[in-house]
């Protein structure tokens, strides 16, 4: 008998995941450049735990909705450019 074709990547579930990934990334990119430093450090510390990622994105979306016209405070919101809480635990190799 012939084997049933396996499901190929790129079906509906994966596409939704890809769109969700880009929505989350755009939200983080926008908000991480505009939030106050304390909040950014808290979120960066929370992002070290994979279980808290959705909570961080949700809080970032709420912050973005409440502060629509917030000014840009920094060029980048990454941990490397903004060392702080929990940054000493990791060694970043570039």
Curated annotation (Swiss-Prot):
Seems to function as a Vpr-like protein, since it mediates host cell cycle arrest in G2 phase. Cell cycle arrest creates a favorable environment for maximizing viral expression and production. One of its GO terms (cellular component) is host cell nucleus. It is found in: Virion; Host nucleus. It comes from Maedi visna virus (strain KV1772) (MVV). This is Probable Vpr-like protein. Keywords: Cell cycle, Host nucleus, Virion. It holds the Pfam family Lentiviral_Tat.
